[in-house]
Amino acid sequence: MKFYCLIRFMIIANLYSSYQISLPGTYPSQILLDMKNSPLVRFNISTRDYKDETLWIRKNSTFVYIDTAVTTANVIFYLPIGQVRQMVFFKRPISRLLTSNNLVKFINTGSYANHTFKTELSPYLSKTNTPLKKYEIVVDQPTGENPPAGFGSLKPADFLNPGYKFVLTSELVGAYTKRSCFVDPMDSLVPIDYDHVRTIIFGSAGMEILMKMGITLASMTISTKYNPPIELIISAKYRNLSLLWPPRQQYEPVNKGTGRPHWIYLLGVYRNVSDSERDSYMNMIKSLGDSMDYHFLISRAHAQMLILAAEDRLVDEMHSFRNVIARLFVSLFAFIRNAFQSGYTSLNDIIEIEADLRLIVEGISSAAFRKDASTHFLISGTPIKDSKADLIKSLLSKVIRPISGHTRPLSAIQHLFLLRSAYALDIPRQNGSLSEQVSTVALSFIENIHSEAMRDILSWNTTTKHALYYAFASILQRPLTEWGASRNARRAILLASSMCTEEHVIATELAIQELYVKIRSNADPIHLLDVYTPCLSSLRLDLSEHHRIYAMADVVFYPDIQQYLKKKSHEGNMKEDDLETKAEYILTKLRSPLIRTLSAYASEVLSCSDQDLLEINAILILPVSGIGSYVVSRRAGMQGIVYTVDGVDVNNQLFITYTRMPCTTTIGNIVPTVLSRPSGKTCPYCGCVLLRYSADGNIRYSIYISSPKLQSELIAFGNSSIRRFNPTTAQIYGNSLLLYPNGTIVRILAFESERVTIISATYIATAVAGSIIALTVIVITVRMIIINMRYNYQGYNKVIDVDDDIRN
C-alpha cells in the first residue's frame, strides 16, 4: 500500500492530521511524495535557534527531514528538478545530476558504521619547502615601498609584471564573503554555518563537480552517470560534523589524529575493506594531505592531469580523474586560506588561480569527457566581478590597445602575462572590442613565433609554450559571431600546422616522456602547459603514427629518459614502448576534439565528408581560404577536387581533396612546374602551403607561406636561409607540393632536380676493396671449375680407351 503526503513549504510549520504542512509567508509549492509503510511515517521538523548551532533554522530557511520509524528503512527523498526549483525552504544550486537516481541508489548502501574510512597518512609537513618555478622570474614579496593595497591602486603596467603587485584580501573579496549555511549536497550531514567565498560548478552531460569554497570549510561533490557519487569536505580542526541519521551522531574525519591542520571528511559508497572503490577514495584523501602551499598543490594537480591523459584504461582514468579533481579542490582551498591568513595576495596569484582553474577544467573535458566534450561547462563564482572586473578590463584595454596597433612591442614573458590575464577573466569568449584587440595581439604574437620557428632560431622554453597556448586560446575561444573571429582562427590553425613539423613532433614526444619520468620521480614542479605544442592547436592528425625514425637524427636525447630506461633495462623494450605510448596518449587526449574544431572553423569539411570516415582516414586538414580547405587522407571518398598523390607506397597511399561548398566531386591533376619569380612587390604565393612528403607516404611538414618574407625565402631555393625551402638542405628524399588557396596543386621540380648526393671517401674505399675481393673470389671459383672439368674430361677419355681395348 502506498501513502501519499502533500507538503507545503513556508516559513512557520503547522502540522495537520492529513500530514499537510503549511508554512505561511511565501508562495506555496505542492510536492507529492510517494512513501511506503504509511503507518510508520513521521515528520521531524526542527527550528534553529541562532544561539544553538545544533538546530536548523536560520534567516527564514527551514530544513525538513522525513524519515520512518523503522531505522533500516530511512531514506532522504530526491525530487524531480522541476519540483526542486519550487522549493524555498533552503537555498542550493540546482543540479540535474545531483538530483538523479545515483543518490537514491548509492548513498544509503551499506551500514552507517562503514561510512568512516581510516588510513595511515604520512606525517604532515607544516613548512614544506617547495621550489617555485615561475616562468624563469623571481617572485617578489611585499615591502615597505611596495605594500599591499586596494584594487584602485592597480595600474596598466602591473599586468606586465603581476608578481610585483599585491592586493589586500579584504579589498579583493569585500562583501562577497558572507556568513552562509552549508547544506551538504548529499543531504547526509546536519547543516552548519560557514564563511562562504565562492562556488564552482563544472562538468559535462554525463558528469558534474560542485565545489563550495569557504575560509575554514569547503566541500566537493563528484556526481557521474555511471559511478557512485563522492563528497570530500575539508574543515577546520575540532569542528565536528553530525549525521542526519542516526540523529546527531558525530561523523568521524578520515585523518583524525594525523596532526594535520584540517580535518578531511569523506561521504561515499563503501561496503568493506575489499571494496575496489576504497583504494580510489584513499588516493584522493592522500592527495589532500601533503601541504597547504598553493603552488605546490596546484603543481601536483597539473602532474596528475598528465597522468590522467596518459591512461589507457577506463578504470585507471576514473581513479586519476578523481585525484585531479581532489588536488584542484584542495589547491583552491589553500589559496583562499592563505590569502585570509596573510591578509594579502599577489596580482599574479589572483590571475594564476583563475587561469589554472580554467586550464585544468578544459584539460579534463578533453581527457576525461571525450565522449561528450562538446557539452562541458564551467560556472565559476569569482571575487573578480562587477566593478572589479570592469576596472581590470579597463586597465587591460589600456595595455592592449597600443600593442594591437603595433605601436608597442612586448617580450615573450610580457605576452604571457597579458594573454593569461585575458584568459583568466574569460575575455576571449566575450563580445566586444576588447576580445577583438586581444585576438589581434595574440595572432601577431603567433606569427612572430612562426617566423622564428621557420628560421630555427626559436627556443621552445616554458615561457614560449605557455604564451603560445594563451595566444591560441585567445583566438580559438572567440564567439564566431564576432567580426574576424573565423578568419583569424583559420589563419591560426594554418600557422599551428606549419610549426608542427615531423622533427617538432618527435622532439615534443621526447620532452613529454622526460616530463612523465620526472612526475614519477617527484622532481621539479610540473605544469600542464609544459607539454604544450602548436600541434595541439593544429589539424595535423597523424601524431601517433610510428614513422619518424629518420627524423630522430636532429633530435637531442634526454639524459633523464636514458637513466630511467637504464634502471628499467630488465624489462627490455617494453618500458621504452610504454613511454612512447603514454606520450602519444597525452598528445591525442589534450587536443580539442576534431569534429568540434571543424564544425566551428571548417564546416565545409564536415558538409562534404562522412564524419566517421573522416576521423579514421584524415591525417591533415588545412583551411587555406575563407571558403575552402584541403584534406590529406589515406583513402579517397570526400567530395571536392580529388588529387591522387603519385610516387608513394601503395600500402600507405595519399589523397588530397579540396573541399568547398557546394560539395561536387571532380578529379584533379597535379602538374609539375618550376616556380617563377614574382615581379615587383606582388605576393602570389602568400597563402599557399608547401607540403612535403616521403616516398613511404608520410607527411614531413606543411609550411604556410604567411608573408612576403617567407615567399622570398621560398623562391630563393638553393640560396634560401630556411632549410626547408632549400633543396640542398631538405635532407630526406621526397616530393614537394604547393597547395594554392583556390584548390590548385603543383609539384615543385626544384626539390627533385637539385638533389645532392654526398659519398664519403671511406665509403668509396670500402666499396673498391669489396669489389676487388669479390672479383678475386669469382676468378678463383672459375679456375676451380675449369680445372675440375679438365680432370673429369681426361678421366672420361681413359675409360673410353680401356673399353675399346677390351672389345678388340
Swiss-Prot record:
The keyword Transcription does not apply. Keywords: Fusion of virus membrane with host cell membrane, Fusion of virus membrane with host membrane, Glycoprotein, Host cell membrane, Host endosome, Host membrane, Membrane, Sialic acid, Signal, Transmembrane, Transmembrane helix, Viral envelope protein, Viral penetration into host cytoplasm, Virion, Virus entry into host cell. Residues 1-17 form the signal peptide. The keyword Glycoprotein applies. The chain crosses the membrane at residues 762-782. InterPro entries: Herpes_gH, Herpes_glycoH_C, Herpes_glycoH_C_sf. Residues 18-761 are virion surface. It is found in: Virion membrane; Host cell membrane; Host endosome membrane. Residues 205-266 are annotated as: Interaction with gL. One of its GO terms (cellular component) is membrane. One of its GO terms (biological process) is symbiont entry into host cell. The heterodimer glycoprotein H-glycoprotein L is required for the fusion of viral and plasma membranes leading to virus entry into the host cell. Following initial binding to host receptor, membrane fusion is mediated by the fusion machinery composed of gB and the heterodimer gH/gL. May also be involved in the fusion between the virion envelope and the outer nuclear membrane during virion morphogenesis. This is Envelope glycoprotein H. It comes from Meleagrid herpesvirus 1 (MeHV-1). The gene is gH.
